């Protein structure tokens, strides 16, 4: 499975129930095609950078997920045919560096420390532990 991020913007004229229904629909598209949603951000109603289809605002939603590449074609097709979707994007994270960035974004969305920070903390702890051992060995030999 590959790592992806998707964001879509819904029309501001939708009522809360319709927004929830659209979000759930796209989440189900991912999971029904054996995708795994790691986390999501419901960003709410925001001003658009520029007018889209006569709208100055839109409802933003972002999801970070893992899926097979074949599922992306269907997801994008469903975005395109839905008149309530003003804009969408699907970003694929491929290289090791990109996947690490994807994990950092997921961790930030979940309010967890990033994987890179955890690795640094573990390394730091290991180095300080080895230093303590060396110090205690040195003091016993005196």
UniProtKB/Swiss-Prot annotation:
GO BP: translation
One Gene Ontology CC term in the entry: cytosolic small ribosomal subunit
InterPro entries registered for this protein in UniProt: Ribosomal_bS6 (IPR000529), Ribosomal_bS6_CS (IPR020815), Ribosomal_bS6_sf (IPR035980), Ribosomal_S6_plastid/chlpt (IPR020814), Transl_elong_EF1B/ribsomal_bS6 (IPR014717)
Similarity section: Belongs to the bacterial ribosomal protein bS6 family.
Protein's name in the database: Small ribosomal subunit protein bS6
Keywords from the named record: Ribonucleoprotein, Ribosomal protein, RNA-binding, rRNA-binding
Keyword Ribonucleoprotein attached: yes
Superkingdom of the source species: Bacteria
Its biological purpose: Binds together with bS18 to 16S ribosomal RNA.
Compositionally biased intervals (Basic and acidic residues): 110-133
Keyword 4Fe-4S: no
NCBIfam families: S6
PANTHER family per UniProt: MITOCHONDRIAL 28S RIBOSOMAL PROTEIN S6, SMALL RIBOSOMAL SUBUNIT PROTEIN BS6M
Natural source organism: Helicobacter pylori (strain P12)
UniProt xrefs under HAMAP family: Ribosomal_bS6
A Pfam family matched in the record: Ribosomal_S6
Gene name per UniProt: rpsF
An annotated Gene Ontology molecular function: small ribosomal subunit rRNA binding
């Amino acid at each position: 499975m590959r790592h992806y991020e998707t964001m879509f913007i819904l029309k501001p004229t939708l009522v809360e129930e319709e927004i929830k229904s659209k979000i759930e629909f796209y989440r189900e598209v991912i999971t029904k095609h054996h995708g795994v949603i790691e986390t999501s951000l419901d960003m709410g109603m925001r001003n658009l950078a520029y007018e889209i289809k006569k709208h100055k605002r839109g409802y933003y939603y972002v999801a970070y997920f893992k899926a097979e590449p074949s599922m992306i074609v269907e997801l994008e097709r469903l975005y395109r045919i839905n008149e309530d979707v003003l804009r969408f994007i699907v970003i694929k994270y491929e290289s090791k560096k990109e996947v690490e960035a994807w994990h950092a974004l997921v961790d930030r969305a979940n309010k967890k420390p990033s994987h890179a920070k955890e690795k640094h903390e573990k390394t730091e702890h290991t180095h300080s532990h080895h230093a303590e051992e060396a110090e205690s060995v040195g003091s016993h030999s005196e």
